[in-house]
Amino acid sequence: FFSSRRRHTRYISVTGVQTCALPIWAGVLPADADQFNSLSEKLITRFRTIFPNGGFVHFSSDADFVEDRQTVRFLEDLAQQAGLEPQFVAIDQIGLNADGRFVDHENWIIQAMFKLYPWEQMLRDDYAAPLPTADVRVLEPAWKSILSNKAILPLLWERHKGHPNLLEAYFEGDPGQATLGNSYVRKPLFSREGANVELIDRGVSAEAVVDGGYGQGRFIRQALHDTPRFDDAHVIVGSWVVGDEPAGMSLREDAGRITRDTSRFVPHFIRD
């Protein structure tokens, strides 16, 4: 999406895992280079699937946070291309009418809405109680709150212990955490961009993000597994899924071992 962090000029070949210091616009990429990115096309298709008859859809975020607002603008544009009528409403301008329906700043009833706002925060707000009866379709759906809660990690490990795609994880205070030894990562159940994450390496706090506002709740402990490092950057690969199909790949790099809100989105290219 339109992240304010996209300001880096290193390019990584996914197959060769090699760096090229020259910028992409200099025309140095080979003619057969490709990028794994079908995000726009798949989102347009998905909007049409969810709303086959078109219609009015609200989009909401914090209006003053530039990165979130630009992301929502991008989605509004795709919704319009899909034949919908997007309408933005700031998250703090959503109200409740006498019939228990959510309304926007112009008193239009919100029937369907994409919100760039955490479900866990939404469920703590004053308007959480009317949600089940407000007759509003919310994108992303409420079950996505389970995936953004790190409590799922110990539960997955408990059900699928030893799975190669999982790291050993326990709720803090669980006797099982002793098997992690003296190297692990301490994470809040709710946290974003590395906030309040601490990395313990051989019994020593090797790196920590002390701010972020997530330090008061419960924590998990997860086995320490360092991300790959190229030159002076630690790199992680992320992906977007639209519906049930992969739609794009992202590379984020950070100078530290914890990926933070200052990490960089790095363009990529793929060669056969």
Predicted regions and their residues:
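Domain-scale recognition of functional cores that engage charged ligands
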Residues: 21-272
